Amino acid sequence: YDYTWLQAVYSNGISPFNKKGTSSNFLDERFSQSLEFVKRLEETNRNYQVTSNDFDLGKVAFRPFTFSDYRTYMPYPWRIKKYSSFEWTCIRMPAGPSGDNRSEMSALMAGMSSRTGKKQAAWDFIKMLTTDEDIQRLIYEDTSAASVLKSVNTSKSTMNLLNKDTPGDSIIDMSLLDTVIDTGVIPYRFKDYTEAYEKTDNLIKGYRMVPN
């Protein structure tokens, strides 16, 4: 449920567009492989519209989750309330025949204005926010995001923090999380990316509706 063509494309070692958005990779064999895979996957549902409720009832074998969603619903009591009828855990995204177990990752960027009169102070502040382990550890305490520091992501204190309210044996594997971050794909966000993606998405939806 909720597995998209874009996720399949990334996991097959390719992106829909080049870095500047001046050309697409639609004619690449890896792109067509990805679309065919998603189409065959959807055909197994035999026109049944799978919903999030099917997952909640334990009728779905696999569903992509964001890290923030995982953190929201794994701890007690939310997990017991929403997913009490079955056990579930996290694994890496499936790999395409020409790719790897990769998934899209959103990154929060920090920047400094070229017009600032306090360049050194601004640069020191950015470095402090991004390299200080105590500050980076607060990300796990106060948000549903992940740190940019491997030392924080793989630390025992972080693992204990994430798993303290998780019932049973369903713990978050920090080495898995670190690997997912290392192999994550940050999309090329060129100027007209949203428009290009929406047009592509509509075309692909039409392609998937055409019978063989």
List the predicted regions and their residue ranges.
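Extracytoplasmic/periplasmic solute-binding protein
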Residues: 1-24, 60-62
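Extracytoplasmic/secreted proteins, especially bacterial periplasmic and envelope-associated proteins
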Residues: 4, 30-37, 50, 59, ...
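Glycine-centered hinge/linker elements that transmit conformational signals in sensory
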Residues: 7-9, 19-49, 93
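Flexible glycine/proline-enriched surface loops and loop-helix/loop-strand junctions
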Residues: 13-24, 105-110, 181-185
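Alpha-to-beta junction loops
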Residues: 57-69
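Pocket-flanking alpha-helical
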Residues: 70-78
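C-terminal capping/gating helix-and-loop segments adjacent to ligand/active sites or protein-protein/ligand interfaces
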Residues: 165-212
